[in-house]
Amino acid sequence: MKLTKIVGLMGAFSSLALASGLNTNTNQSAAYLRNVARYATTEADAPYYNPAGTAFMTDGFHISLNSQAFWQSRNTYTESPLFGGEKKFRGKAQIPAMPSAMVTWHRGNLALSGYFGITGGGGALNYKDGFPSFDVAVAQIPGMLTQNGLETTDHEADISLTGTSYIFGFALGASYRIVDFASIYLGARFNYAYNHYEGELKNIKVNPKNEILGLDGSMVEAASTFNNIADYLAGKAGEAAGAAEQYAAAAEKYAAAGDKASAAQSKAAAEQYGAQAEELMVKSKTLEAVAAQVSDRELDVEQTGYGITPIAALAINYKRLSFGLRFEYNTSIEMENDTKVNQVGIDNYNDGVKSDNDIPASIYAGLTYSLLDNLRLSLGYGHWFDSKANLPGKQEKYADDTDEFLYGVEVDFLTRWTLSGGVQVTRYNLSDEYLSEMSIILDNTTFGFGLAFRATDWLKFNLGYFHSLYKDWEEDVEYGKNTYKRESRGVGVGIDLDI
């Protein structure tokens, strides 16, 4: 029984990042959902994807307002004799609204731009039925009791975990066209990080059967039952200790009277009762400890921190070719606990404790080429230097940087309509030590498609759909085998204004 250690795994809740890096959301606009390869764009969402490209916009204000909704599942299928086969543990996340706003002011060769968005995380991940390691720990109780002479065949418990993670980003910067076809950008993003972990392990019940103890095989509350049995054993230990003292006193009297045979018999009885008392007390203390382990436990911890990301970018816009390059420096974020309840005995969750939660440095490159006036092809690449960052729990030693590859196509038709689609391939390059039932970060391929409609010369609507398919991962564990599966889908709507 290592329930406190298991509850401590809550710290492994990874970012709820929806696209790309371990701690980064690159899905910042509805236009991105319909065409993921946007690192060379010069449209209204350029302040995030290609900030240097804002220098090639027309004079005036350019605004992009977006909202996205996502649905995720992170499921674990556990094969174990403890469950009599396979058991499914469901994790679900629903993000009803993920807003973002981007603004550019352009005049001459200069552009000032900024954006707000949820640049990491994005919602709450809920495990209503807990995790395999939680359930396995409870499932081991019947076997443990049976081995110690208390026949038990079943168990049940109320287990729930919820992890919430957000990184809110506010960025400002300026781009300048240094020559007709090239521009540079310098800026920074302020990041405010927020995590909230809530966990409950309650109402653990078992069905022990023992006539002497008055247990008939019905479900009973484990902690109170173990405490009652511990008290019963302690009482019996006291009786045995009392008998040992009486026989020891009798042995002394017989010895003083010269009755060696009776003295020897009394001494042997005293030793026997003394050993019995010691054994019963050990069992009583053990059950007290087990009762404490299976008693109701709660965890309620909020973590907050902030950091600043320096950003530099370059853009080239030459005839039918657009190119964008962006570098974001490593962002050091130190999270501090605000603990409401910590009944799990893990010091890392104590109030005021600090931990690392860096946003790794990253580099992005994009290329868009217009084959025809109404047909554009795009390519993109992103790289996150995960192994160089300070990640939660020193996980960087199990990470070998993330790579993403993006492909997109857009076709204009009927004057005001645009049809687009794209593919994003993400490879996290993580070792097995990084991955766990609470850190299901899996390589994936994402498909996005959608439409844009330019209602007027200054108003455009974007609609996109995003669907990620993840590679399954299997892990051999001491109690059997876990298979991890994940799926994500989302929709986005946006309005672009050119004033």
Model-derived regions: residue spans:
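Outer-membrane beta-barrel porins/channels
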Residues: 20-37, 42, 98-100, 106-499
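Outer-membrane beta-barrel translocator/receptor signature
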Residues: 40-49, 55-127, 134
